[in-house]
Each structure stands twice: as structure tokens, then as C-alpha cells.
């Protein structure tokens, strides 16, 4: 099986604080892994570096055969293949859950509204909140918001999912 994510000696500092120290990791296609650790141990920093939302200072990160660095030219194309659910769910409060899930597929993937809504409803059903599709984020519990954020990421049909 081929590698979809590869990290070699990845280091990241915030001023004098080293958030990531010599991280080495290989993830194969279709493989599911869990990175666990206490608060402040660098888990979120690591996934933000994989998606180039944070810059790593040393080492190599390769995602689906593309090295991720300041020289990466088509980072948006790579990001379109990497779904991400943030600690703060970042749902748009003024949009329904359904609209939160259809926005990126319509704008980025150029799907029709009908196509995007069908995919969104499939994914909302997958995370068991399809009955909440017309509600707004503030009307859902924290757990439901997390599932809505996961469904939203799945609507882009990513090769890789980080959360």
C-alpha cells in the first residue's frame, strides 16, 4: 500500500517553545491512525502543518506525493484533497447546517446546488444529524456541531481527513 502522508524529522517552534520535535510518521492509503497526547502536546499543530496552515521550520512533509513547504505552488489543490475538522468547528452561524455543508462543494468543486445538497444530506445522515439540516449551528449541541463540521468536511470527498 502506498503512503498518503509522510513526515520526516519535522520540527516547529513558536518563538523559543518547540511544539514539534523530530516527528516521523508514515500513513498509508486507507489507514486510520490516532495521535493522542495531553493538551499542548502539538497534536493540532501537527495537523495544521500537514495542511500547511502552519509552517514547519525543519524536516519534510509529503502529502499524496507532494512535498509541503513554502515552495509548494498549488497548495489550494492539495488542501482540496485534505479534509479538516478544527477544534473550534468554524461553522458559519448565519447559515443552516445544510448550507454550511454545501458552500465549499458549490464554490470549490463547482457542483450544482442540487448535487451539493444530495451529498450533504448523505453525509449528514452518515453522522446521524440529517434531521438537523435546516437548523443553525447555535441551535445544536456541541456534539451535534462537531458532527456537522465532520459532515461538512466529508462533503468535499477528501482523500485524507484530519481532525
Language-model regions, residue ranges each:
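ABC family nucleotide-binding domain
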Residues: 3-163
Amino acid at each position: 500500500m502506498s503512503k498518503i502522508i509522510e513526515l520526516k524529522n519535522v520540527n516547529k517552534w513558536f518563538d523559543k517553545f518547540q511544539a514539534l520535535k523530530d516527528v516521523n510518521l508514515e500513513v498509508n492509503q486507507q489507514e486510520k491512525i490516532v495521535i493522542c497526547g495531553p493538551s499542548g502536546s502539538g497534536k493540532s499543530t501537527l495537523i495544521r502543518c500537514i495542511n500547511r496552515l502552519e509552517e514547519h521550520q525543519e524536516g519534510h512533509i509529503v502529502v499524496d506525493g507532494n512535498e509541503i513547504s513554502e515552495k509548494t505552488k498549488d497548495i489550494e489543490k492539495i488542501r482540496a484533497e485534505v479534509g479538516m475538522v478544527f477544534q473550534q468547528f468554524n461553522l458559519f452561524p448565519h447559515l443552516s447546517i445544510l448550507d454550511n455543508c454545501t458552500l465549499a462543494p458549490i464554490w470549490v468543486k463547482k457542483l450544482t446546488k442540487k448535487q451539493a445538497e444530495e451529498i450533504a444530506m448523505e453525509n449528514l445522515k452518515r453522522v446521524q444529524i440529517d434531521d438537523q439540516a435546516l437548523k443553525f449551528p447555535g441551535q445544536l449541541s456541541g456534539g451535534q456541531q462537531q458532527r456537522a463540521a465532520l459532515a461538512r468536511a466529508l462533503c468535499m470527498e477528501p482523500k485524507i481527513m484530519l481532525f
